[in-house]
Structures are given as C-alpha cells and as structure tokens.
C-alpha cells in the first residue's frame, strides 16, 4: 500500500503538528483509493478534545467531528481515507493506544515532532485482525 500526498499537504500537516507541540494534534486525510494506492487530496485539522493534562500523549475527537468530516469529504466526491496525528518527542511509530483505537481499512500518518520540529513521518495500516500495524509507503510528490 502506498499513500500519495503533495509536499504542500505534508507541509500543512507539519505546520499543524509543530503548532500543537507539546501536545498531540491531528485530523483527517481526505482522498480516494486507486488500486493499491491511496491519493490524499486534502487534510482537515480537528481539535484535540482529550483532557488537557493528557493531550501531550493522547488525541481524541468527537463523533460530531467525524460526521462533519464525512459530509465535507462526500461533498467533494471524496472519502475519509485516514487519520493523521503527531507523537510529541516520540518516534513516528504507532503506540499500543493507537492500535486499540484504530480502525482497519484506514491509513494512519504519524508525524514525530521533536522539540517542536517535525522530523519524521510514516504511514501505517492496521491489520484486519487488529493485532498490529503494518508499515506502508509514503510517497511525497511536488
């Protein structure tokens, strides 16, 4: 599985994640499936509603956020294909918390933000049996 996004969209994610630091930030990936590829056409930031004292290592959104983002993607003729979030002062590797709360068939882009700077970004897909994530290929295009 390869996930394609533009440099501009990657920079949008990096900027949001750096502004969210030292807390986690996140949002939705909007796009479409093309065979084994997922094309990201837009990213939509969503506010972190986790308890303030936990936002440095947890991210959550409301069901209303989810529904609104689905409507927005539908209006564009696209779909919610994934979710992105940051790991402040931690690697771009899914945590067990991420695995427990993830959905199969959704891609997960994780950005490592060290000392306020986005330093790494990786894409992951949860196995159907929810036992672990598998690494995908992130293709950043001009």
Which ranges hold each PLM region?
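Conserved beta-strand-loop surface patch within small alpha/beta domains used
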Residues: 1-80, 88-142
